[in-house]
Amino acid sequence: TLQQFSRDADEIENWIGEKLQMATDESYKDPSNIQSKHQKHQAFEAELAANADRIESIIAMGKNLVDKHQCAGSEDAVQQRLGTITEQWKYLAAKTSEKSLKLKEANKQRTFNAAVKDIDFWLGEVESLLKSEDSGKDLTSVQNLIKKHQLVEADIAAHEDRIKDLNALAESLVESGQFDSDTIEDKRNSINERYAVSYT
């Protein structure tokens, strides 16, 4: 009936309005707890998917009322309402996928920053080992220093993949245009330069 449609349409418009507030909040701009925010958003997406049938059935109900001329002369109003619900639903879906993308990018940035921090710390240790003035005082100490140096060289070589991953991640973040590209480039270049120096 028309009354049922009106009640359901009111309910669904209110529900979409509530969900839009969640879909358009910019919590992704604060990098703290980004993984938890991403998980919450995935649950939010699942909730939207679970309600898609409900929205489709309200739209179908409205179209049916219009087609059968059961709108008590309010066909245009019902038609307009259907248009509004359809537009709001599309807008909600678009904003939700946009937020999903931004959360993924923010998560990538968190991963990048953590990797920079780890590699920065590791490079600091390597640099202090390579700066050592100790050249050994006898054959045994020289052999120990050579072994130590070989281990450092092996460690440096073993970090090559992590450096490549860091560069790929930086590239992806810069291309997305979501974040401060200059800062990302500066961090990446600093790591690459220090790594190149440690390799020589």
Regions found by a protein language model. Name each.
Residues 1-199:
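Extended alpha-helical coiled-coil rod segments
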